[in-house]
Regions:
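Strongly charged
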Residues: 2-11, 15, 23-27, 35-96
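Glycine-centered, phosphate/nucleic-acid-interacting loop/turn motifs that mediate DNA/RNA or nucleotide
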Residues: 32
């Protein structure tokens, strides 16, 4: 009955379809390309909660994407399900 109020960062990124494979999500985090609430993290096991703000590298251009976590997932769903996990704050503004 007690649902977790957090999720591993690499797992959430995989659920949100940032990368095709969870290992790719972990590699992205380990190289320091992801920020949680403006803090760089290199730990795939970092915990995120609803309301956290993530900074992600843009693709294919190098701009930064800023997303707010609005939901946690228990499984990887369709692309439309993944879009419900975050709110785009800003995308492709070129700020680093």
């Amino acid at each position: 009955m007690t649902a977790q109020d957090y999720e591993r960062l690499d797992l959430w990124l995989w659920h949100a379809r940032v990368c095709r494979h969870r290992q790719d999500c972990a590699a992205l985090i380990e190289k320091g390309a992801v920020r949680i609430n403006r803090q760089v993290t290199r730990k795939p096991h970092s915990k995120i909660r609803v309301g956290d703000v993530l900074g992600l590298p843009g693709h294919p251009r190098p701009e930064v994407r800023i997303w707010r976590v609005v939901a946690l997932a228990s499984r990887r769903g369709s692309a439309s399900d993944a879009a419900l996990l975050y709110e785009v704050i800003t995308e492709n503004q070129g700020e680093s």
